[in-house]
């Protein structure tokens, strides 16, 4: 049987969305570089989407894009553009325009999570094997339970809650569809990043006294909070 040379298939990827606001280019670039310095494992050479909803149509898009690319980030698409002039500039630069509805699976730097019409059901994705560096596990419309260790460089994503009953050294993103009621439960906290509905902490934002201990991470008043747990 002869196979076709290509095949189109749907898949899910987690991308960071950077919301660009009106500011001098050098200020924007410095802010991006500061973020990369804070979380190099997550952001260095990372693929990102730029949201330009708050960007002035009078901006010099080509110069701004060149400056952003100079930081090492790889811009894969642009969202939030409602101005015809800016749209034309973006198209000329060779980047695709996408709508917010297409970016619901993306983690975001905004303080307001994207709201989704998806409802989390009672299904649970259960994994007993170790999660290795470079692996990505996605629990669509469900909770995710890991009963083993998660290595640095691994990524856990769930539209529901995430439970890790092992050493957690990777990234955990709960409420990936925008559900702010989701939580992360972990037996041994050493994560590179934790996120709930787009709100995130990198490793050095987690209280030092809770590292290596059990904790529950949740959203309170649109900000991440952590509560020690005793098993």
Curated annotation (Swiss-Prot):
Pfam family, one: MinC_N
Keywords of the record: Cell cycle, Cell division, Septation
GO BP field: cell morphogenesis; division septum assembly; regulation of cell division; regulation of cell septum assembly
Metal-binding is among the record's keywords: no
UniProt entry tagged with the keyword Cell division: yes
Top-rank taxon: Bacteria
InterPro entries for the chain: CAP/MinC_C, MinC, MinC_C_sf, MinC_N, Septum_form_inhib_MinC_C
Gene3D superfamilies, A to Z: 2.160.20.70, 3.30.70.260
Quaternary structure note: Interacts with MinD and FtsZ.
Function comment: Cell division inhibitor that blocks the formation of polar Z ring septums. Rapidly oscillates between the poles of the cell to destabilize FtsZ filaments that have formed before they mature into polar Z rings. Prevents FtsZ polymerization.
Annotated family: Belongs to the MinC family.
The protein's name in its UniProt record: Probable septum site-determining protein MinC
The organism of origin for this protein: Baumannia cicadellinicola subsp. Homalodisca coagulata
Gene name per UniProt: minC
């Amino acid at each position: 049987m002869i196979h076709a040379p290509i095949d189109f298939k749907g898949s899910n990827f987690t991308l960071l969305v950077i919301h660009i606001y009106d500011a001098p280019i050098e200020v924007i670039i410095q802010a991006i570089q500061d973020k990369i310095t804070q979380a190099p494992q997550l952001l260095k050479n990372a693929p990102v989407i730029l949201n330009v909803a708050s960007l002035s149509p009078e901006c010099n898009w080509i110069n701004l894009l060149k400056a952003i690319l100079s930081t090492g980030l790889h811009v894969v698409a642009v969202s939030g553009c409602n101005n015809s002039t800016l749209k034309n500039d973006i198209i000329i630069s060779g980047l695709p325009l996408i709508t917010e509805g297409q970016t619901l699976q993306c983690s975001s730097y905004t303080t307001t999570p994207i709201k989704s019409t998806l409802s989390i059901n009672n299904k649970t994705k259960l994994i007993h094997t170790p999660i290795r560096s470079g692996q990505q596990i996605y629990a669509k419309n469900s909770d995710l339970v890991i009963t083993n260790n998660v290595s640095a460089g691994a990524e856990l994503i769930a539209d529901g809650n995430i439970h890790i009953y092992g050493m957690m050294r990777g990234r955990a993103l709960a409420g990936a569809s925008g559900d702010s009621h989701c939580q992360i439960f972990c037996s041994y906290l050493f994560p590179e990043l934790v996120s709930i509905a787009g709100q995130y902490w990198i490793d050095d934002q987690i209280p030092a006294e809770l590292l290596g201990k059990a904790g529950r991470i949740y959203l309170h008043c649109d900000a991440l909070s952590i509560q020690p747990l005793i098993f």
